C-alpha cells in the first residue's frame, strides 16, 4: 500500500473526511513519527507495533569498484517491531478483524 492509497482508503472509510484533509492527516502523522525517531524517541502503537532505532556499529567495508578498504562510520537506522495482534493477523489470520474492528454488539 502506498501513501496515496492509504489516504484514499482513509477518505473512503470516513465520508465526512475530504481527500485533502485525509492527506493532511496522514502527512502530519508521518511527520510526527519521523520527528520523534530523529530525536531518538521510540514510537509504540498498541496492537500494531513499535518503531525504534538500531545502532549499526562502525566497520571496515570495501569499495566494490577498487576493492580498497573503507571505514564505514557508526549510524542509527529505523527499525519496526510488529505487535502481537499484527503478527497473528499476518500469520494466516488475514481475514480476521483486529479486536478493535469488531462491532460492540458482537462481543
From Swiss-Prot:
UniProt keyword terms in alphabetical order: DNA recombination, DNA-binding, Transcription, Transcription regulation, Translation regulation
Gene3D superfamilies reported in the protein's UniProt record: IHF-like DNA-binding proteins (4.10.520.10)
Keyword DNA-binding applies: yes
Superkingdom assignment: Bacteria
Alphabetized GO MF terms: DNA binding; structural constituent of chromatin
SMART domains associated with the record: BHL
Gene Ontology terms: cellular component: chromosome; cytosol
Segments of skewed composition (Basic and acidic residues): 65-101
UniProt keyword Transcription regulation present: yes
Any Pfam family hit: Bac_DNA_binding
Region named Disordered: 55-107
One of the GO BP terms on file: regulation of translation
Function: This protein is one of the two subunits of integration host factor, a specific DNA-binding protein that functions in genetic recombination as well as in transcriptional and translational control.
Subunit relationships: Heterodimer of an alpha and a beta chain.
Similarity section: Belongs to the bacterial histone-like protein family.
Name of the protein in question: Integration host factor subunit beta
Species per Swiss-Prot/TrEMBL record: Burkholderia mallei (strain ATCC 23344)
Amino acid at each position: 500500500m502506498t501513501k496515496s492509497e492509504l489516504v484514499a482508503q482513509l477518505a473512503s472509510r470516513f465520508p465526512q473526511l475530504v481527500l485533502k484533509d485525509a492527506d493532511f492527516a496522514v502527512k502530519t502523522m508521518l511527520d510526527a513519527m519521523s520527528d520523534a525517531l530523529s530525536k531518538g524517541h521510540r514510537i509504540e502503537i498498541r496492537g500494531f507495533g513499535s518503531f525504534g532505532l538500531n545502532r549499526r556499529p562502525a566497520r571496515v567495508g570495501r569499495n566494490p569498484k577498487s576493492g580498497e578498504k573503507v571505514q564505514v562510520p557508526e549510524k542509527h537506522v529505523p527499525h519496526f517491531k510488529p505487535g502481537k495482534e499484527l503478527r497473528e493477523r499476518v500469520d494466516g489470520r488475514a481475514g480476521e478483524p483486529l479486536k478493535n474492528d469488531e462491532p460492540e454488539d458482537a462481543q
